[in-house]
């Protein structure tokens, strides 16, 4: 009786916690007077994720398909890291890699340049070089086309069900789209790699390459994310990426780490001049208005004991049941049906 009761109580408690976590990920809790209102966000699409619990704290049109612009490069960098290619591998830049669409942001590569995978990754994430994206794609998969197939395959594996890529850099294309929720999934994979975190949080980096003629070339690039060096928030913001096209508007994903909190703020299609304020306002909302409670740790520090009436006289614990708890990490999202492009 004692063991059966303990198992039932534990299962009920675990089921309740798991069900709550899954529900929180896909819809906001009902409004209540004691839940502070979120800040006014100018962005058309947004999402705030607590990385410690994988809980969505705020969302705005998070499942509507839209253009991600250069935030696409988060997936590109992730696939380079997952490929296992050595960082000191030297790539010879092809004519095709530098033949990017007019108006692209570029690292400034020339055909025949020789440059390491590591420097290409910095050029991808800091300068947002479309030429660096294509050079990396060719290094990993042999061609941009094959790499794009890998991007879509990996997106499907991750459950990014409203995403389709047509290039490795995010230059505007009506067939190249994702959602705020899908990019949160991708970003969560990205930050699992220490190197990628280091790159995304770097304010600047010195690029070294060898030209086709054999001359050495060195130049310093700066991160397009101004929040990394912001006097007020620079100590808390660690990446990840900015993006802009006329179609996508102003986009940014930031990781906000402050006093034990770890948040991901995703902003898409924000009006000119509002992007960074939107990202920080959303992150601060999560930091100031929510807190994380570890129920498993609380139970470890102060156990709950239940007394069972009419227990067996042979029970060495005299009918005393100690309730224990274990926790399981919830999924960031449940599979979402395709949503139309707005």
Question: Model features per residue range: what roles?
Answer:
Residues 2-22:
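Sec-dependent N-terminal signal peptides of Gram-positive bacterial secreted proteins and lipoproteins
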Residues 15-16, 86, 294-297:
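Residues in and immediately flanking transmembrane alpha helices
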Residues 17-25, 311, 330:
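Bacterial Sec-dependent signal peptides at the C-terminal "C-region" and cleavage site
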Residues 18, 116, 143, 223, ...:
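Secondary-structure junction/capping motif
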Residues 22-181, 185-194, 258:
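Active-site-adjacent loops and short helices of periplasmic peptidoglycan-processing enzymes
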Residues 160-164, 172-342:
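Domain-terminus/edge residues, biased toward the C-terminal soluble/receptor-binding domains
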């Amino acid at each position: 009786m004692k063991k059966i009761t303990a198992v039932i109580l534990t299962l009920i408690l675990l089921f309740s916690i798991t069900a709550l976590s899954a529900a929180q990920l896909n819809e906001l809790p009902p409004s209540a007077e004691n839940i502070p209102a979120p800040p006014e966000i100018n962005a058309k699409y947004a999402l705030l994720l607590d990385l410690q619990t994988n809980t969505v704290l705020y969302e705005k049109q998070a499942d509507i398909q839209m253009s991600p612009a250069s935030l696409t490069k988060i997936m590109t960098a992730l696939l380079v890291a997952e490929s296992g290619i050595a960082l000191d591998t030297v790539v010879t830049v092809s004519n095709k890699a530098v033949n990017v669409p007019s108006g692209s942001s570029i690292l400034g590569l020339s055909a025949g340049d020789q440059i390491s995978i590591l420097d290409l990754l910095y050029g991808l994430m800091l300068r947002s070089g479309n030429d660096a994206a294509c050079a990396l794609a060719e290094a990993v998969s042999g061609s941009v086309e094959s790499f794009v197939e890998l991007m879509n395959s990996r997106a499907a594996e991750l459950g990014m069900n409203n995403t389709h890529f047509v290039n490795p850099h995010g230059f505007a294309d009506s067939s190249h789209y994702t959602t705020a929720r899908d990019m949160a999934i991708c970003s969560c994979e990205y930050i699992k790699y220490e190197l990628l975190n280091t790159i995304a949080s770097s304010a600047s980096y010195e690029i070294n390459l060898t030209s086709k003629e054999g001359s050495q070339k060195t130049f310093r690039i700066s991160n397009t994310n101004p929040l990394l060096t912001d006097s007020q928030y620079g100590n808390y913001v660690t990446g990840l990426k900015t993006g802009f096209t006329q179609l996508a508007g102003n986009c940014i994903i930031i990781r906000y780490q402050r006093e034990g909190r770890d948040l991901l703020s995703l902003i898409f299609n924000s009006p000119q001049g509002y992007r960074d304020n939107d990202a920080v306002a959303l992150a601060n909302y999560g930091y100031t208005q929510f807190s994380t409670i570890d129920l498993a740790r609380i139970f470890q520090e102060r156990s709950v004991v239940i007394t069972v009436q009419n227990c067996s006289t042979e029970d060495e614990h005299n009918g005393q049941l100690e309730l224990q708890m274990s926790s399981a990490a919830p999924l960031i999202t449940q599979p979402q049906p395709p949503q139309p492009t707005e």
